[in-house]
Curated annotation (Swiss-Prot):
Belongs to the bacterial ribosomal protein bL19 family. GO terms for cellular component: cytosolic large ribosomal subunit. GO terms for molecular function: structural constituent of ribosome. Signal peptide: none annotated. InterPro entries: Ribosomal_bL19 (IPR001857), Ribosomal_bL19_CS (IPR018257), Ribosomal_bL19_sf (IPR038657), Translation_prot_SH3-like_sf (IPR008991). The lineage of its organism: Bacteria, Bacillati, Chloroflexota, Chloroflexia, Chloroflexales. SUPFAM superfamilies: Translation proteins SH3-like domain. This is Large ribosomal subunit protein bL19. GO terms for biological process: translation. This protein is located at the 30S-50S ribosomal subunit interface and may play a role in the structure and function of the aminoacyl-tRNA binding site. It comes from the Bacteria. Keywords: Ribonucleoprotein, Ribosomal protein.
Amino acid sequence: MSQQIIEEIERRYMKQDVPEFRVGDTVRVGVRVVEGNRERVQEFEGVVIRKRGSGLNENFTVRRIASHGIGVERTFLVHAPRVESIQVVRRGKVRRARLFYLRGLTGKAARIKERR
């Protein structure tokens, strides 16, 4: 009984327009950022290296290489109100559920094949 109530409340806060994406896909995440009194959307594009959780607690980690070859990782909740949009840029073909090995690779070695 209490589990049904929890699921009903969670369903109310879940987004409906979340695209289907997997680990290895390159995604562009639009995050709402508040700077002083103004608000803007900041894009963060990179490879999904981890997905975990389910329902309202589902989250994913995106890794990209910033300037001067420094790797930047950000973890997002799929249904968070600050996450405005998630776009799949390209689909990757990987055989792992976690791509933490990409942390040790740079340049062409860190490329992921495209899924057809």
